[in-house]
Design a protein with these regions (language model features):
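Short, highly charged C-terminal tails/helix-capping segments
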Residues: 49-56, 161-173
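A short, structured loop/turn motif at beta-sheet edges
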Residues: 22-25, 88-94, 114-125
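Hydrophobic pocket/interface hotspot
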Residues: 28-32, 38, 88, 124-126, ...
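Alpha-helical packing segments of well-folded alpha/beta enzyme cores
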Residues: 153, 157-161
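Glycine-rich portal/gate segments that line the openings of hydrophobic small-molecule binding cavities
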Residues: 50-104
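Beta-strand/loop substructures that line and gate deep hydrophobic ligand-binding cavities in soluble
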Residues: 98-152
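Hydrophobic ligand-binding cavity/cleft-lining segments
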Residues: 2-63
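Short, surface-exposed coil-to-beta transition loops
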Residues: 14-16, 80-85, 107-112
Length: 173
């Protein structure tokens, strides 16, 4: 399920995407908070580089509220198209993080992900709020193009997560 909020005159937009997975929240959390898990979600369209100081660390080992480094988005895994100046705003309670960062083309980027157990599986809930930088907004159709790209990307991420979880469930049975 995908929701979009924001008005034509507003520079900020918000998306929410939810998916139900057939594996536990703990198992999903272990996957989605690793560089490998993040890049698996983005594959094949994007790959994110990992700043050196973050390599080999679990999300709960990272400081909140501090700049953590620059991650590059590589289209098809090779072509740099944007960067993310990563700041982890919050971790927890339980299986939750909130990233508040900026990018080359996006002034503010707030990505909150919550994973919770439901029934015999789990639910992944992403909430993304962003504000594009003004120069891009002067290009006719740019805002709509960016919204379309981000909607596609988050749907794709959840499709990849659903596929990963189904494969994990098969392995566990």
């Amino acid at each position: 399920m995908l929701y979009l909020r924001g008005t034509e005159g507003s520079m900020k937009s918000t998306f929410e995407q939810k998916s139900t997975l057939p594996v536990s929240a703990a198992e999903v959390w272990r996957h989605v908070t690793t560089p490998e898990g993040i890049n698996d979600e983005l594959f094949p369209w994007l790959r994110m580089t990992i700043p050196a100081r973050l390599r080999g660390k679990a999300i709960d080992q990272l400081p909140c509220g501090q700049y953590l480094g620059r991650s590059w988005f590589l289209a098809l895994g090779v072509l740099p198209v944007d960067f993310d100046d990563i700041t982890l705003a919050e971790v927890g309670p339980e299986y939750r993080f909130k990233e508040a960062s900026s990018m080359l083309g996006i002034r503010t980027w707030v990505h909150e992900r919550t994973v919770r157990d439901i029934g015999e599986g789990s639910e992944v809930h992403d909430r993304l709020s962003f504000e594009l930088r003004r120069p891009g907004l002067w290009i006719p159709g740019w805002r709509h193009a960016m919204i379309g790209i981000l909607k596609f990307l988050f749907r794709h991420r959840h499709t990849r997560l659903i596929r990963w979880a189904a494969d994990r469930k098969k392995l566990n049975n």
